[in-house]
């Protein structure tokens, strides 16, 4: 199953991917900035069906500050590295600078332990597979996570409901984003759910038919 939370003033979607058989889970984009948001996330993980889940991975779709507002406290709480693509590591070091502009009270996170992932790598959360697909264009290091057993893809800020991520920030590139979305995301089956970094969910078939950026 996939549990969604929406955190901080940028309304970022944080996802918890749960393997219900093994009670293992992965946290994707821990955006919980406020202490009450931390508590919501920790309470879900630690009281799931009256038992505690084992967090095995803390994943980032990308390292823009709104998506990592809770990264340090989550990594420290579960004593795990952050799992991400190498091309986005510099954004951890720039978190404080970006945060001061965007209203986030975060420090630089370049000291956090990083477990690097590559395009097409398969992660296992218990018996649940997560396929890592590198989809740059919104920013360096941007990943989409495909979950075949859930018929879903977590797209971060690459793909939204009938829209796409902005490409005017450092490292963004519009042609690259369009090409990667068409070749790496829209090739998934039409019935796959699209779980974006902001806003409501969609479906691959609907994005292929109605997303004007991708027609």
Segments from the language model and where they lie:
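Active-site HxH/HxHxD metal-binding segment of metal-dependent hydrolases
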Residues: 32-124, 210-213
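Short acidic-hydrophobic surface loop/beta-edge motif
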Residues: 5, 17, 119-125
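Conserved S/T- and glycine-rich ATP-binding loop of Class I adenylate-forming
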Residues: 17, 61, 135
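Conserved Rossmann-like nucleotide-binding pocket used by diverse enzymes
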Residues: 3, 59, 131
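Conserved beta-strand hairpin/beta-sheet module of binuclear metal-dependent hydrolase folds
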Residues: 1-46, 144-156
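Short Gly/Pro-enriched turn/cap motifs at secondary-structure boundaries
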Residues: 5-7, 113-114, 134-136
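Metallo-beta-lactamase
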Residues: 23, 32-35, 49-51, 97-98, ...
């Amino acid at each position: 199953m996939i549990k969604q939370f929406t955190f901080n003033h940028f309304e970022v979607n944080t996802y918890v991917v749960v393997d219900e058989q093994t009670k293992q889970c992965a946290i994707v984009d821990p955006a919980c900035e406020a202490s009450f948001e931390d508590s919501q996330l920790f309470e879900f993980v630690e009281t799931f069906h009256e038992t505690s889940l084992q967090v095995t991975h803390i994943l980032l779709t990308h390292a823009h500050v709104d998506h990592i507002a809770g990264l340090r406290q989550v990594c420290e709480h579960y004593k795990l590295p952050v799992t991400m693509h190498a091309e986005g590591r510099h954004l951890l070091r720039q978190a404080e600078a970006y945060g001061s502009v965007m209203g986030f009270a975060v420090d630089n996170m370049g000291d956090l332990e990083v477990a690097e992932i590559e395009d097409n790598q398969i992660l296992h959360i218990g018996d649940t597979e997560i396929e890592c697909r590198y989809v740059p264009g919104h920013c360096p290091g941007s990943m989409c996570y495909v979950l075949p057993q859930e018929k879903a893809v977590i797209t971060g800020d690459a793909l939204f409901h009938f829209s796409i991520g902005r490409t005017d920030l450092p490292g963004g590139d519009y042609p690259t984003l369009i090409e990667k979305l068409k070749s790496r995301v829209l090739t998934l089956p039409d019935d796959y759910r699209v779980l974006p970094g902001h806003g409501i969910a969609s479906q691959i078939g609907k994005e292929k038919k109605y997303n004007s950026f991708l027609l």
